[in-house]
Amino acid sequence: MRKPEVAIAASTHQVKKMKKGLWSPEEDSKLMQYMLSNGQGCWSDVAKNAGLQRCGKSCRLRWINYLRPDLKRGAFSPQEEDLIIRFHSILGNRWSQIAARLPGRTDNEIKNFWNSTIKKRLKKMSDTSNLINNSSSSPNTASDSSSNSASSLDIKDIIGSFMSLQEQGFVNPSLTHIQTNNPFPTGNMISHPCNDDFTPYVDGIYGVNAGVQGELYFPPLECEEGDWYNANINNHLDELNTNGSGNAPEGMRPVEEFWDLDQLMNTEVPSFYFNFKQSI
């Protein structure tokens, strides 16, 4: 059985055999000659066969990142930047897969370039776009609020000026009590009894509340009686007779000289309302 001191000494001797740290030019030349002549294989065997006191991981990283012939040097081109941004949007932080799609670039190099340059640039562009959007939306809200305030001020000014004119006596106080329920008051219209059968048709077309705030009045097309018309004609004839028909001009003579009023009023005229109901 081997003594513990001997086993510890052997293990420490093996550890001391593996070199760490910077690579010397002689080590780089040994690794390059072996890789060009034998090709890539198991990296532990490469370290042993090349006569290097390095581990397999150290040989692999040295070859991929520094010694391989197709390795690109220098800054990234704009095309490479676009590819990195596109691949990163698809693959995320899988730098080895991104490097496999960019010939001549290493995963460590791509990761450092992303964190130092591209990531900051994209963040700055997003902040600028958000600032532009906020500045473009703020004038619209300001214009809307200013228009609303201006309209409210205009209404207040109109009402205030109207009240001041009323206080000074320029406006009749009775004008302030305007009936809005009926825009055509019946007091100022000629009253006449007419048939209301046409009212449902008017309501069906224009609606019941077709006025400003109340019902819009449409005179019916057919009337049952014509007393109001006869009364107005008779009053007009009386005035002409009182003033003297002989002195009146030829165009202002009484109507009886031209036609018979009784016969005219008793003549049956086809009604539009009757034809309208028949067509329906």
From Swiss-Prot:
<keyword id="KW-0804">Transcription</keyword>
<keyword id="KW-0010">Activator</keyword>
<dbReference type="GO" id="GO:0050832">
    <property type="term" value="P:defense response to fungus"/>
</dbReference>
<feature type="DNA-binding region" description="H-T-H motif">
    <location>
        <begin position="95"/>
        <end position="118"/>
    </location>
</feature>
<feature type="DNA-binding region" description="H-T-H motif">
    <location>
        <begin position="43"/>
        <end position="67"/>
    </location>
</feature>
<keyword id="KW-0805">Transcription regulation</keyword>
<feature type="region of interest" description="Disordered">
    <location>
        <begin position="129"/>
        <end position="150"/>
    </location>
</feature>
<dbReference type="GO" id="GO:0045893">
    <property type="term" value="P:positive regulation of DNA-templated transcription"/>
</dbReference>
<dbReference type="GO" id="GO:1901348">
    <property type="term" value="P:positive regulation of secondary cell wall biogenesis"/>
</dbReference>
<keyword id="KW-0238">DNA-binding</keyword>
<dbReference type="GO" id="GO:0000976">
    <property type="term" value="F:transcription cis-regulatory region binding"/>
</dbReference>
<dbReference type="InterPro" id="IPR001005">
    <property type="entry name" value="SANT/Myb"/>
</dbReference>
<feature type="domain" description="HTH myb-type 1">
    <location>
        <begin position="15"/>
        <end position="67"/>
    </location>
</feature>
<dbReference type="GO" id="GO:2000652">
    <property type="term" value="P:regulation of secondary cell wall biogenesis"/>
</dbReference>
<dbReference type="InterPro" id="IPR009057">
    <property type="entry name" value="Homeodomain-like_sf"/>
</dbReference>
<keyword id="KW-0677">Repeat</keyword>
<feature type="domain" description="HTH myb-type 2">
    <location>
        <begin position="68"/>
        <end position="122"/>
    </location>
</feature>
<dbReference type="GO" id="GO:0005634">
    <property type="term" value="C:nucleus"/>
</dbReference>
<protein>
    <recommendedName>
        <fullName>Transcription factor MYB46</fullName>
    </recommendedName>
</protein>
<dbReference type="InterPro" id="IPR051953">
    <property type="entry name" value="Plant_SW-associated_TFs"/>
</dbReference>
<dbReference type="GO" id="GO:0003700">
    <property type="term" value="F:DNA-binding transcription factor activity"/>
</dbReference>
<comment type="function">
    <text>Transcription activator. Involved in the regulation of secondary wall biosynthesis in fibers and vessels. Transcription activator of the mannan synthase CSLA9 that recognizes and binds to the DNA consensus sequence 5'-[AG][GT]T[AT]GGT[GA]-3' cis-regulatory element of CSLA9 promoter. Transcription factor that acts as a molecular switch in the NAC012/SND1-mediated transcriptional network regulating secondary wall biosynthesis. Is directly activated by NAC012/SND1.</text>
</comment>
<keyword id="KW-0539">Nucleus</keyword>
<dbReference type="GO" id="GO:0009834">
    <property type="term" value="P:plant-type secondary cell wall biogenesis"/>
</dbReference>
<dbReference type="InterPro" id="IPR017930">
    <property type="entry name" value="Myb_dom"/>
</dbReference>
<dbReference type="Pfam" id="PF00249">
    <property type="entry name" value="Myb_DNA-binding"/>
</dbReference>
